[in-house]
Amino acid sequence: MIAASTPDAGCVALPGLSGNLFVVTGAAGGQGAQEALLLAANGADVIAADLREDAPDLRAAADDLPGSVTYRRLDVTSEEQWRDLADSLAGRAVKGLVNNAGVTQRTRIGDVVREDWDRVLAINVTGPMLGIQALLPLMGPGSSIVNIGSAAGLTGHYTAAYTTSKWALRGLTHSCVTELGPRGIRANIVHPGYIRTEMTADAPAPFLDANVTIAPLHRGGEPEEVANVVVFLLSDAAAYVTGAEIGVDGGQFRSGVATFLSEAVRSAQHPAASALPH
């Protein structure tokens, strides 16, 4: 079950969220769901999009929140579906877009299948670009784009397609900063490390153990911890923050453990095809 992440009593709600509209992809579960729920907990209206037909747990968790969560099935690689989503908003202003949908592929470079390579790049890079293109006409000054990268996008992991896609997403983010800044639109990217979700449970045990053991904080992250950073970046509290790259990884990247983690994956002899969230 998905639990709503509601601000503690007495906390001041983040400015610029209540009453505004946000779109979050990959929102049927994991950190995407928590991002949608935290926005709704701050009074925002959220379009939670995902490839699944429905997300009943997400909708149930949002029932008692001050904002709203509307679920919509979306293939982020479909230009037509993005266009239909934009048209369905009837010209309502979009305050923020979170490009959270993503998959990985744990495969040696020499074993990468072209079809799998194309799929990872289509979802992780082309999807965010199509979303930005479709919603940009509805975004004005004060709007915000948050792309979800990965610690793999800061170094070289044993996941060639995934790592390449996250480096590319950084480039797309930087282009948005330069091009959209004069229009008052901000763009930032968040780099999660190992985040505990139902989808990361099938990752190789040596990889998970290495994440917990070697990270300076000695634990995995929770989806809510990523959501906290994402929602801050969407809010007016971050009105002068654009071009930021924020790691939510327990210090893994800065402690230089990327090579060890890559070796842990390599040694695990895990099946090649595996889709994981960030």
Annotate each language-model stretch with its function:
Residues 146-168, 173-182:
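Catalytic loop of short-chain dehydrogenase/reductase
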